[in-house]
């Protein structure tokens, strides 16, 4: 009986120290995609297929546009053309 309790305790300790999900506080993962610069040129609308907004954990807000060729382009969310493209993509 003592052996079972010892083995079980050891397994619990190993699981607690080896599992990052159990040992890290919730929400502590760093953001996976952040933009540090914005494009200086307006993208042609017919090049853009999709978009997403970066995480609020990033140092600056950004909209990332996906192009037909699979490229990702960071844009300033306060630019008028960016808002227009986002609205257009939401409607389609």
From Swiss-Prot:
One of its GO terms (molecular function) is CCR chemokine receptor binding. SMART domains: SCY. GO terms for biological process: antimicrobial humoral immune response mediated by antimicrobial peptide; chemokine-mediated signaling pathway; eosinophil chemotaxis; inflammatory response; positive regulation of cell migration. InterPro entries: Chemokine_b/g/d, Chemokine_CC_CS, Chemokine_IL8-like_dom, Interleukin_8-like_sf. SUPFAM superfamilies: Interleukin 8-like chemokines. Transmembrane segments: none annotated. Monokine with inflammatory and chemokinetic properties. Belongs to the intercrine beta (chemokine CC) family. This is C-C motif chemokine 4.
């Amino acid at each position: 009986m003592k052996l079972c309790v010892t083995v079980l305790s050891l397994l619990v300790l190993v699981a607690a120290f080896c599992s990052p999900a159990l040992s890290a506080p919730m929400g502590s993962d760093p953001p996976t995609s952040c933009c540090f610069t914005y494009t200086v040129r307006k993208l042609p609308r017919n090049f853009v297929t999709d978009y997403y907004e970066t995480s609020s954990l990033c140092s600056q807000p950004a909209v990332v546009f996906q192009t037909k060729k699979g490229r990702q382009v960071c844009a300033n969310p306060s630019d008028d053309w960016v808002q227009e493209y986002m609205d257009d993509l939401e409607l389609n």
